[in-house]
Swiss-Prot record:
The keyword Glycoprotein applies. SMART domains: PbH1. Involved in maceration and soft-rotting of plant tissue. Hydrolyzes the 1,4-alpha glycosidic bonds of de-esterified pectate in the smooth region of the plant cell wall. The gene is pgaE. This is Endopolygalacturonase E. One of its GO terms (cellular component) is extracellular region. It is found in: Secreted. Residues 1-19 form the signal peptide. Keywords: Cell wall biogenesis/degradation, Cleavage on pair of basic residues, Disulfide bond, Glycoprotein, Glycosidase, Hydrolase, Repeat, Secreted, Signal, Zymogen.
Amino acid sequence: MVTSSSVIGLTLWAALVSASPVADPLVTPAPKLEDLEKRATSCTFSGSEGASSASKSKTSCSTIVLSDVAVPSGTTLDLTDLNDGTHVIFEGETHFGYEEWSGPLVSVSGTDITVTGADGAYLNGDGSRWWDGEGSNGGKTKPKFFYAHDLTSSTISGIYIQNSPVQVFSIDGSTYLTMEDITIDNTDGDDGEAANTDGFDIGDSTYITITGANVYNQDDCVAVNSGENIYFSGGVCSGGHGLSIGSVGGRSDNTVKNVTFYDSDIKSSQNGVRIKTIYGDTGSVSEVTYKEITLSDITDYGIVVEQNYDDTSESPTDGITIEDFVLDNVQGSVESSGTNIYIVCGSDSCTDWTWTDVDVTGGKTSSDCENVPDDISC
C-alpha cells in the first residue's frame, strides 16, 4: 500500500532532482580497433619466410614468437622500433644463411621490450663458415650477431647463442637494460680459427645490468668501451680475454664511469682483470670496481692495466685517466708462463686506487711496470 506520505516524499525527491544541475557525462573515447590489435595480438613466424614476415608485421603484434626461423643470407632479423611493451620469444633453432657481410644477424630496439628464449631454444650462428683466424681484422667479412641498440627499460633473458661468427652482443645507446641468464657458447672456435668473438661490447649506454651470464669465447667476456652505471654479476667467463674496461679511446665518447664486476669466475682465459686505454688519446675511467672475482688457469696476465694499448712499444700517455679503481677480494691462479700483475700507467694518470685482499699467484712478477700508484703492488 502506498501512503500519502510516501507520495509526498517521492514528489519532493523528483522535484529536487529535476531542479539540480546535472554534470556532463564523462566521455572516454573508444580505443581504435587497430590499437587494440597491436596490444593484444600474438603472432608466430617460422621457416624461411619467418624473418621477413616478422619484420613486416612487427608493429601489429604485442607478442612475436619466432619458431625455427631461417634468416636468409645477408639480411638482418629486424626487430627494431617495436611497439612499447612488445614481447619477443625465440623457440627452437634460429639459423642464418651464409654471406660475407658485416651484419648484424639480429637487431632489436624499443621501449619496455622483453626478449626471451624458450626452453631448448638457441640461435645458431654456425660461425665456422666464417672463421679464418682473422676475426674482424681481416680475411672474410663476418657479421656481428646481436644488436641491442636503443633499448630503454627492457629485458633480454634466457638467450642461448652458439658459434657466433665474430662479436656477439653489441649494446649501444641503451638505458635501463637488464640481461639475465645469457649463454654464449663458442667452444667450437677453440681450434684457433675463431677470433674477436667478444661476449658483450658496451658503448654509450647507462644502467646496464648483466646477471648470470655464461660465456665461452675467444675475446673479451665483457668490454665496457664507454658508458656509466654498468653492473655485471654472477658470471662465468671461459676461454677469452677476461672482464675488460676498454679499450677506451678512439671514439666520440671516451668516458667510463661507475662500473662493477661482482661475484664472477674467469677461467682458462688470456687475462683476468683488464683495463686498456688507447695510446695518445683523451678520456676518463673512474669508479671501477672488481669485487669477489676468482681467477683460474690464466695464461697471460691475472691483472693488467695498459695505458699504451694499440702501441705497446711506446711509453704510456696521460690523456685517459684511471681514477678510483677498486679491487676487493680478487684471487686466483696464473699459469707459470704468465704474469700475475702488469701495470703500465702514464706519469700522472692513475690515481686513488684501492686494492684489498688481492692475491694472484702462480705466474711471474713483472719488472716492467711503470708509474704504479702508491700502495699498489705490481
